[in-house]
């Protein structure tokens, strides 16, 4: 519709609205109950048309004052207003639902490996652990991959190409998703996975289910350089564009200390400050305890523990230790978020524990009860038994007097806090249920308070779901890999 037509419609609409408004006001009574002078003059001069005017007035009053009439006029004006706007084309999210790339991806070149290290280096896929046969005790640790988006060649006819380690399956499924987004209609093809016939070299991770040889279902060799790059982005620990006919990828062992616990936790011996003023070990915390936390402004507040993201008192893990100049010591897993104060910018950020550096500032509770910056003097690592990850309503917790996040793996505190909003809502709804509250009161009288926490052993189901989804929706730079 051109501008002249729109202007004409606007003029008609304005005239109609003004006419209806004038007629509506002309028949409204004055505050003293008298009719307006215009109506009196009209009645004196046109007595014969009184009946017609009254009927018309009632009709106008009905149109002007009923909700149906008001809605009709509003819709008419909105329609005319919409016609005055020109349509615009917006950019869509691209093919599929995959995460957007932050940078351009460059294909690998023939014979290139990422990282440029030996495959058995600790920073790559790590050392060999020994071949696995069907009758080996470790064979039960391998898994089958039935992903329908992956084409398995299976030359042997035994299904061996579907057998692999858990980490290898995770990365392979992620790569299959990326391949479908990169080339619609093309699937990832696995030509070799676990090898029980020892058809490779003496030292091969194929024998452990930690390596795969891949290609594309259309056998288009021009895609293989980009396929190798996608494998790197998917998280394979070592990728080699070894041949023009295929790509070789391998991963760390599932029992590798560097990946044995990818979530964020504290040690059970670490303590939190209760609202009563008493200190309590994290291994003894219970849902409903109110512990010292930190609000969005960096001020100390007490917040309720609503669940445990993870809790396993027997698992042995590697931890990072932060020592401050005030004597505080925080022991936490490398992927956990720690609050770091930047005095130059006067801002508070959250970074992964293994990326905190000496001379950084962390917030520590002082003798007055306030959270004050203290310098990190020394960093170390320690191996300890047990992991505990309480989640408070604030999303933060002060452990061993050091302010830390309740979240890990994801670099954004606000995004992680938003992701746990359903659990906070569920906790609130449960607190409003009298029956549940009465049941909890009855249980508190008959059982120790920490029985609630002891019922959980392992990763919380909702946290586990978020950890699995993150690889598909978040950029790699946002994750602790």
Swiss-Prot record:
Alphabetized Pfam families for the sequence: HH_signal, Hint
Site positions (Cleavage): 264-265
Residues of the propeptide: 20-90
Lipidation (N-palmitoyl cysteine): 91
Residues of the signal peptide: 1-19
Residues involved in Ca(2+) 1 binding: 155-156, 161, 191-192
Keywords assigned by UniProt, alphabetized: Autocatalytic cleavage, Calcium, Cell membrane, Cytoplasm, Developmental protein, Hydrolase, Lipoprotein, Membrane, Metal-binding, Morphogen, Nucleus, Palmitate, Protease, Segmentation polarity protein, Signal, Transferase
Binding residues annotated for Ca(2+) 2, in chain numbering: 156, 192, 195, 197
Keyword Ion transport attached: no
Residues of the site described as Involved in auto-cleavage: 333
Annotated site location: Involved in cholesterol transfer: 310
Residue ranges of the region described as Disordered: 26-56
Residues anchoring lipid (Cholesterol glycine ester): 264
EC number(s) on file: 3.1.-.-
Gene Ontology biological process terms from the UniProt entry: anatomical structure morphogenesis; cell fate specification; cell-cell signaling; intein-mediated protein splicing; protein autoprocessing; regulation of gene expression; segment polarity determination; self proteolysis
InterPro entries, A to Z: Hedgehog, Hedgehog_Hint, Hedgehog_sig/DD-Pept_Zn-bd_sf, Hedgehog_Signaling, Hedgehog_signalling_dom, Hint_dom_C, Hint_dom_N, Hint_dom_sf
Localization per Swiss-Prot or TrEMBL: Nucleus; Cytoplasm
Cysteine pairings via disulfide bonds: none
GO molecular function, one term: peptidase activity
Record's GO cellular component terms: cytoplasm; extracellular space; nucleus; plasma membrane
Key word Transcription present: no
Residues the UniProt record annotates as site (Essential for auto-cleavage): 336
Family label: Belongs to the hedgehog family.
PANTHER family in the record: HEDGEHOG (PTHR11889), PROTEIN HEDGEHOG (PTHR11889:SF31)
Subunit field text: Interacts with shf.
This protein's name: Protein hedgehog
Encoding gene per record: hh
């Amino acid at each position: 519709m051109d501008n002249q037509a729109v202007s004409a419609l606007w003029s008609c609409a304005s005239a109609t609205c003004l006419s209806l408004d004038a007629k509506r006001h002309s028949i409204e009574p004055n505050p003293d109950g008298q009719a307006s002078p215009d109506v009196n003059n009209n009645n004196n001069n046109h007595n014969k048309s009184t009946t017609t005017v009254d009927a018309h007035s009632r009709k106008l009053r009905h149109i002007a004052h009923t909700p149906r009439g008001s809605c009709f006029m509003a819709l008419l004006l909105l329609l005319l207003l919409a016609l005055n706007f020109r349509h615009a084309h917006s950019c869509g999210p691209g093919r599929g639902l995959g995460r957007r790339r932050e940078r351009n991806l460059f294909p690998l070149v023939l014979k290139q490996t990422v990282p440029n290290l030996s495959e058995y280096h600790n920073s790559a896929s790590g050392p060999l652990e020994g071949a696995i046969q069907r009758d080996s005790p470790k064979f039960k640790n391998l898994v089958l991959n039935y992903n329908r988006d992956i084409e398995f060649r299976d030359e042997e006819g035994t299904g061996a190409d579907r057998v692999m380690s858990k980490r290898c399956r995770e990365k392979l499924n992620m790569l299959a998703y990326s391949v479908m987004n990169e080339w619609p209609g093309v699937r990832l093809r696995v030509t070799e996975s676990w090898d029980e016939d020892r058809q490779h070299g003496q030292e091969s991770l194929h024998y452990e289910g930690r390596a795969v040889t891949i290609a594309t279902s259309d056998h288009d060799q021009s895609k293989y350089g980009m396929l190798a790059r996608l494998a790197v982005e998917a998280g394979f620990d070592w990728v080699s564009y070894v041949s023009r006919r295929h790509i070789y990828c391998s991963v760390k062992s599932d029992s590798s200390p560097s990946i044995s616990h990818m979530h964020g936790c504290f040690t059970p011996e670490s303590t939190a400050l209760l609202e009563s003023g008493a200190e309590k070990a994290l291994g003894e915390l219970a849902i409903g305890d109110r512990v010292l936390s930190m609000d969005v402004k960096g001020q100390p507040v007490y917040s309720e523990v609503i669940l445990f993201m993870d809790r396993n008192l027997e698992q042995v893990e590697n931890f990072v230790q932060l020592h401050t100049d005030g004597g505080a010591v925080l022991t936490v897993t490398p992927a956990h978020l720690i609050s770091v104060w930047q005095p130059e910018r006067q801002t508070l950020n959250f970074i992964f524990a293994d990326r905190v550096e000496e001379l950084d500032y962390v917030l520590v509770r002082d003798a007055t009860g306030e959270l004050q910056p203290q310098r990190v003097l020394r960093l170390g690592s320690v191996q300890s038994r047990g992991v505990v990850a309480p989640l408070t309503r604030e999303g933060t917790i002060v452990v061993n007097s050091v302010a830390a996040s309740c979240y890990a793996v994801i670099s954004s505190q606000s995004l992680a806090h938003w992701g746990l909003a359903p659990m906070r809502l569920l906790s609130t709804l449960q607190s409003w249920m009298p029956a549940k509250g009465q049941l909890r009161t009855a249980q508190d009288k008959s059982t120790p308070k920490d029985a609630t926490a002891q019922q959980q052993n392992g990763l919380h189901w909702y946290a586990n779901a978020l950890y699995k989804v993150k690889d598909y929706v978040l950029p790699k730079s946002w994750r602790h890999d």
